[in-house]
Amino acid sequence: MLKGKVAVVTGGTRGIGFQIVRKYLANGAKVVLFGSRQESVDKALKQLKEENADWEVEGKFPKLTDAAEVEKAIMEVKDKFGKIDILVNNAGISQSTPLYDYTPEEFDKVIDLNVKGIFYAILPTAKIMKEQGGGCIINTSSMVSISGQPAGVGYPTSKFAVNGLTISLARELGKDHIRVNAVAPGVTKTDMVAALPEQVVQRISAGIPIGRPGEPEEVADAFLYLASDMASYVTGEILSVDGASKA
């Protein structure tokens, strides 16, 4: 499905991001995964190479809240492979702090990574994609971008922003043959969800009509579809993968 494609996946060392990397590699893509630390990048690369030594995968660890570092890393990928066909903006953080305990610093932290970090990756990549005649950008949103959540207001705020960024750029970049979509997972078995208070997870899980949280592999399938030619006329979409949680 992705033979010959070059993909960059941020937040690609664990959880949904790691499964996206696996799906892309298994379907013929060359992948550069971005992680937050060298240790996590090295661990992910080791796991992937042990699974299939023939997979073409590399790793980088730019600070995603630093526009210059992100641009440098993106340009290094382009210089090595000659192009970037797919950009997946999956890196992000969650919060569950009640408003009355919230600090401006906490709010800034989640906005800086979840919103600005995506913009910093898109800006140089979109220019590359325009020059090469097109490409595909997929952002990770969330179910709470539609439903909201009762604590940690910075997180749903950031994901509402991701949706707006996705839809607006789909309209702006369509003429350059760049598709821009987002995937909005529901409760999924990731480290981020595991870090939430148990009562928060239980409350959210109770509203899943399908009766269980999602698996990272199931969410990654949506990213595979959107990156493939099967989605060649799909752009500006926020694809929910949430077991009908928002239905």
Regions found by a protein language model. Give the residues of each.
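Conserved glycine-rich cofactor-binding loop
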Residues: T13-G15
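Conserved glycine-rich Rossmann-like NAD(P)H-binding loop of the short-chain dehydrogenase/reductase
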Residues: N27-K43
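Substrate-binding pocket helix/loop in short-chain dehydrogenase/reductase
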Residues: P98-L99, E106-I111, V193, I204
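Alpha-helical segment proximal to the catalytic Tyr-Lys
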Residues: K127, R171-K175, S232
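Residue(s) in the substrate-gating loop at a strand-loop-helix junction
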Residues: S142
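Short C-terminal tail/terminal secondary-structure segment
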Residues: S147, L224, T235-A247
